[in-house]
UniProtKB/Swiss-Prot annotation:
The gene is sfsA. Belongs to the SfsA family. This is Sugar fermentation stimulation protein homolog. PANTHER family: SUGAR FERMENTATION STIMULATION PROTEIN A (PTHR30545:SF2). GO terms for molecular function: DNA binding. InterPro entries: SfsA, SfsA_C, SfsA_N. It comes from Histophilus somni (strain 2336) (Haemophilus somnus). Pfam families: SfsA (PF03749), SfsA_N (PF17746).
């Protein structure tokens, strides 16, 4: 997917979960909106290079959005977790996710389940079972190992319960971990951070829920990030 026009700055601090202060090259201080409400472990330390977009909306209190971080080790992370669904949709449309490539119809944000949920994507195909796909963002990486979650996620636990129920009804059910960090080539669940989520995911796999994680690649033009896209399946370590 193509990124909007981005500007760079130096990260000063993140606070109140949704906000971050950055310094431009000319010394001006800006406050950015941060769409990622997680712990963002290792995704933004003071002094890192931040890339942000600017909205034309006149109603937004904070028109600038934190999009990416270039870490001191040279790796890049997409901070805007709203991009994960856009990335996944593009990958589904382009048949990049080979495990789901046989489906022709992609329905986003469909209400389902018994806990007042919405599935990220409902896939349909001729003579195929309906496939419920829940997308999660992977931004937490240690030693080239992608981890999810980076904080306790009761919402994620609810989604797993819903997927287990869909599988028991005869549908396909998938948890899709979309890489937003280009530094990992394997994936696992962060048991030490959310043991309840880890236990539920293990149960889901036993019930037949499918787990896939895909890596991400960033394109640059003249040292400026211009696009990102999902590339290939990475190993899932149970």
């Amino acid at each position: 997917m193509q990124l909007p026009n981005l500007q760079s700055a130096t990260l000063l601090r993140r606070y109140k979960r949704f906000l971050a202060d950055v310094e431009l090259n000319n010394g001006e201080i800006l406050t950015l909106h941060c769409a990622n409400t997680g712990a963002m472990t290792g995704c933004g330390e003071k002094g890192d290079t931040v890339w942000f977009s600017t909205s034309d909306s006149k109603t937004r209190k904070y028109p600038h959005s934190w999009e990416l971080t270039q870490l001191k080790n040279g790796q890049t992370v997409c901070i805007n977790t709203h991009r994960s669904n856009q990335l996944t949709l593009e990958a589904l449309q382009n048949k990049i996710i080979t495990e789901l490539a046989e489906y022709d119809e992609i329905l986003p944000e469909v209400k389902y389940g018994v806990e007042n949920s919405r599935i990220d994507f409902l896939l349909k195909g001729k003579n195929l079972p309906d496939c419920y796909v829940e997308v999660k963002s992977v931004t937490f990486v240690k030693n080239h190992l992608g981890l999810f979650p980076d904080a306790v996620t009761t919402r994620g636990q609810k989604h797993l319960r819903e997927l287990i129920a869909m599988k028991k009804r005869g549908h396909r059910a998938v948890v899709f971990f979309a890489g937003l960090h280009d530094g990992f080539n394997r994936f696992t669940v962060a048991k030490s951070i959310d043991p309840d989520y880890a236990e539920l995911l293990q149960q889901a796999v036993k019930e037949g829920v499918e787990v896939y994680s895909y890596a991400v690649k960033f394109d640059f033009s003249h040292q400026k990030p211009t696009a990102l896209y999902l590339t290939n399946l990475v190993s899932y370590l149970e």
